[in-house]
Amino acid sequence: MLKNPLIKPFLSSFLDLAPILAVVLIFQVFIIQQPVPDVARLIAGTLFVILGLTLFIQGLQLSLFPLGESMAYDFARKGSLFWLLAFAFCLGFGAAIAEPAIIALAKKAANIASAANIIEQTNTAKSNYALELRITIAFAVGVAILIGVLRIIRGWPAYYPIFCAYACIALMTPFAPANIIGIAYDSGCIATSTITVPLVTALGVGLATAIKGRNPITDGFGLVVFASLTPIIFVMAYGMFV
């Protein structure tokens, strides 16, 4: 019997990471055929990752997820469209700017851009580039959530904004600088990750539950896919015009 409330989430996090660990170990031992370097440090780091992921997810479930859903419900009940849309944008922006995957991508992109002489090879230039990239992606996610919330309120079909986003991506890709296209497409994949997905889903479901005539199943979902498309558009625009 698991009495400690953290034991079950800890085991769940371990099982989530187990396939990754298994792949790394199998290739290290059987394909590369080299001993695992610094085993003690590797084990300690893995335990830290599992514990950190466990605490992180538990913290979100206890605080931000219920808060996001309840605030969406309250805003919808009060009928203030302006503040609801403002909240949607700020929630999307705030979730994306704190997304660990976006931070990692921005830092890596800055290092590569510096090595390729696209930006100056100084820490200040790399920090500024990474910050600008993070803000661009976060702004794109904020806009996506705003439009997604407006879609739920107005009852628009989900494919309207999605088709428009795909059309913009297809039209912009041939004209975007080659050095930004890969970053733009990857930013779309990682923009909806650990923090963004649960918060955005909670917002959509809470809003669809509160609005009369909306179904949480058919109307509450669909925000995440749009939030993964707009960063591609905004990052390519950043590369073209900035």
Regions found by a protein language model. Give the residues of each.
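N-terminal alpha-helical transmembrane segments of multi-pass membrane transport
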Residues: 2-84
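Structural signature of hydrophobic alpha-helical transmembrane segments
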Residues: 42, 46-54, 127-139, 187-200
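Transmembrane alpha-helix boundary signature
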Residues: 56-67, 95-105, 178-180, 241
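Re-entrant/interfacial helical elements at transmembrane boundaries that shape
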Residues: 69, 102-111, 162-166, 184-186, ...
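Helix-loop-helix junctions within the multi-pass membrane cores of secondary transporters/permeases
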Residues: 82-172
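C-terminal transmembrane helix-loop-helix hairpin of multi-pass membrane proteins
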Residues: 2-14, 39, 176-242
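Inter-helical loop and helix-membrane interface segments of multi-pass membrane transporters/permeases
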Residues: 1-7, 29-40, 106-131, 178-190, ...
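Hydrophobic core segments of alpha-helical transmembrane domains in multi-pass membrane transport
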Residues: 16-30, 45-55, 87-93, 138-151, ...
